[in-house]
Amino acid sequence: MSSALAVRRVGILGGTFDPVHIGHLRSALEVAEFMRLDELRLLPNARPPHRDTPQVSAQDRLAMVRDAVAGVGGLSVDDRELARDKPSYTIDTLESIRAELNTHDQLFLVLGWDAFCGLPSWHRWEELLQHCHILVLQRPDADVEPPDELRNLLAARSESDPTAMSGPAGHISFVWQTPLAVSATQIRQLLASGKSARFLVPDAVLAYIEAHDLYRASN
């Protein structure tokens, strides 16, 4: 009976991952360990409605994420958004994942501070907390101010201790992360100029990029 009542703790970290880099991976690992998640899924976006079109194909981005997390305990890849032929709205993904979990399982949506501050522009954003808790990755250099809608939401739903969030969904909390000044834009620019991205991406990802000649100026 005890196994039937066990609560699973699942996190999701979405992104274009164009390409996936050590900043994404370090954040994912730190959250998974700090929150003692059973699983943290990296979820590549197919056609993110709030971002520019990715530079390389969904198949390449998915392959790089899979290579990046291969053999890393607690991290996995969820490719459901790549199967859609329409913009990948987060609310649709949350509804889909929640339908696969038990009603008492905890689902955590992991967002960077800038993405969190932009939530009011997201499709059906007011419904997100019906399906998940939100974990905001906080950095000491964050300088974007949240809009009033989020200030009100934080006042009503924030939990000071992220590990104390109870129930399957409904709360917001903050997790401090190691600040790594790495961006996918920076990596693409390096590669386009013929420079190396070594130590900014995992070796397996760099090998994939080189084998498929991705992000070169001609691309």
From Swiss-Prot:
Keywords: ATP-binding, NAD, Nucleotide-binding, Nucleotidyltransferase, Pyridine nucleotide biosynthesis, Transferase. The keyword Transferase applies. Pfam families: CTP_transf_like. InterPro entries: Cyt_trans-like, NadD/NMNAT, Rossmann-like_a/b/a_fold. It comes from the Bacteria. SUPFAM superfamilies: Nucleotidylyl transferase. Gene3D superfamilies: HUPs. It catalyses: nicotinate beta-D-ribonucleotide + ATP + H(+) = deamido-NAD(+) + diphosphate. One of its GO terms (molecular function) is ATP binding. GO terms for biological process: NAD biosynthetic process. Pathway: Cofactor biosynthesis; NAD(+) biosynthesis; deamido-NAD(+) from nicotinate D-ribonucleotide: step 1/1. Its EC number is 2.7.7.18. PANTHER family: NICOTINATE-NUCLEOTIDE ADENYLYLTRANSFERASE-RELATED, PHOSPHOPANTETHEINE ADENYLYLTRANSFERASE. HAMAP family: NaMN_adenylyltr (MF_00244). Belongs to the NadD family. Catalyzes the reversible adenylation of nicotinate mononucleotide (NaMN) to nicotinic acid adenine dinucleotide (NaAD). This is Probable nicotinate-nucleotide adenylyltransferase. It comes from Pseudomonas entomophila (strain L48).
